[in-house]
Amino acid sequence: MEPYPIIRGGKVVGSVVSGSDFTIVEDLHGGRRTILWFSSERGAVVDRLLVDGRVYAPNGLYVDVEQWVEVMPFQPYHSFSDIDSYLQWLVGVVGDVLRGKKVVVGFSGGKDSLVASYILSLASEKLGFKLILVYSHVPFLESEENRGFVEKVANRLGVELVEVEPPKPIFREYMFREGLPYRGTRWCTYLKVRPIREFFKKIGADYLVSGDRLVETLKRFRRLIGAAVKGQIVAGKHLRPTFTWTIMDVVRCVRSLGLVHPDYLRGLPRVSCSWCPYKCLFEFTATQATGWEDLIEKVLRREYRLWYQQRGISWDEFRERRLWRYTPKAAQAWNAVMNYVEKLVEKGELEEVKASSVRELYKRMWVEELPNPPVKTLDEILEELRKWVEANRDKVFAGVNAPSTSSTHRHRARIRAEKWNH
């Protein structure tokens, strides 16, 4: 995951990044605190427990920090001086391609799809292309608050908004058959994206916009670095207008618009569904209800009986620690380590960390006075990334073209297209 800046007094004083149930907080002098969460409100600093990057439970089960936290390069600087100069550059690059076309943005309400939508709304005024935001609401798992925010953004930008949703009967069927989406198998993603692609095809759109950025995740870095080197904003029918933006570019733009998502103000790193398996434990107490909690409870009880109970995990542990986010094997390891860390905290042997203190770190970049960091050219940024790749080759290329490990999954989601219009 991409490290976010910790801002205090108009200065960047460090970074914070979370992955799975770890959070890593670093200062600018190399100081580092690795936090492991054992509940939605409590965690502990576990650096002294680390053995070769792992935290072990007494029974030998362990969780590996590097396996669960992909720490991407920290970019506490801007990649362009101001929005007008970037717009001028973008129009020069894509003007001939976009003029008179239909462009669709898959809009989630998050910061990255917001800035992509904003810069294209400005470009559309100059180039005369049709811009449409398409928001796919996830039934049962996503709060209605996000829908309201998406509508607010579209109104502010003066852009047409189309709302779509996967069929509720199919989504409900998947929930009971497959359990809630979990890490490594988010069947929800296909069901969410399919209505957007169908709309794109229905209206004969020319380009589909992604707000993905280069250093958000390792997977996206591998996919986008070649395009960054080539300066390639358009690839086939895909348009990536902001994929080289840094986190500082994004925050500056979002705050200038006054369109900060409520989740960011609650201290959440990402805008996602209330039941997203990629949330960290500390995020759940600041997450909005969906109104379908009784239904989800039934789903959770079923999958607990089928796949997790035999792993020695209690129902309370499964529910309170949101262990459905993991495969049963991974959940067993996490639960053992969490129990061990919690006991050490109760004995006073580890420093306890409250979830509210980490949420406050994430919130700072949305409310504190913003710093005025340096501006780096794309060539300078690419050179930094080249050095990072050279220093982290094993990590960057680990798992590339590796065989599937689906045997560790609790099951494999099956997308049955013929039932889509059910």
Identify the meaning behind each predicted range:
Residues 164-175, 198-203, 222-233, 267-282, ...:
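Short flexible/disordered coil segments
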Residues 246, 251-297:
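Mid-to-C-terminal catalytic subdomains of enzymes
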Residues 35-53, 269-271, 275-288, 301, ...:
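Extended, hydrophobic interaction surfaces within ordered domains
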Residues 230-235, 292-303:
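Gly/Ser/Thr-rich active-site loops/lids in small-molecule metabolic enzymes
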Residues 149-156, 178-190, 210-216, 286-293, ...:
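Short secondary-structure transition/capping segments
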Residues 2-9, 38, 300-422:
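Long, compositionally biased intrinsically disordered regions
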Residues 2-256, 383, 387, 391, ...:
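ATP-dependent adenylation/nucleotidyltransferase module used to activate substrates
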Residues 156-165, 189-193, 255-271, 320-337:
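A broadly tuned preference for mixed-charge, low-complexity surface segments
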